[in-house]
Amino acid sequence: NILQKLFVALLSLCDFAFLSFFVPLFLGVLKGSFIFMADLMRASQLMCDVEFIAVSSYQNGTVSSGRVQITHDLQQDITGRDIVVIEDILDSGNTLYFLKNYFMTKGAASVTVVTLLDKPSRRTKPIVADLAGFEVPDEFVVGYGLDYAQKYRNMPYIGVLKPEVYSK
């Protein structure tokens, strides 16, 4: 299974990077990252804390509005914490650029970005993932947590959504 191989690679990098010097805060960006984050955490050997944040920039479309809104904020203080942001896809970079700055202003000691999918061709903000699973082309992908209008998240694989589905 290609995802299992990805987990092994990401976890070995993560586990090596963080070793056992501290307990990082794994911070999932809802809703898209929840499946990836759960699988990553189940396979990890790291002792870590868990937190979630929900943001919105897509509403029901396929193109980011460019305006990031926090819809569910952090429930704990992150001052001095090493944050590992777990994201489903790094696309335009608007969301992760916003979040990385937001966490630093909240007092995070460091922010590391781990993403399942990376779409560098769409980047509009100067942000790069510290760890990325797969680079994907400029197509709208769904499944394994990724959605279109809140649909397709539960697919056990990642697929390209046909344009006729979202062009209506």
Give the positions of each predicted feature.
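PRPP-associated nucleotide enzymes
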Residues: 1-168
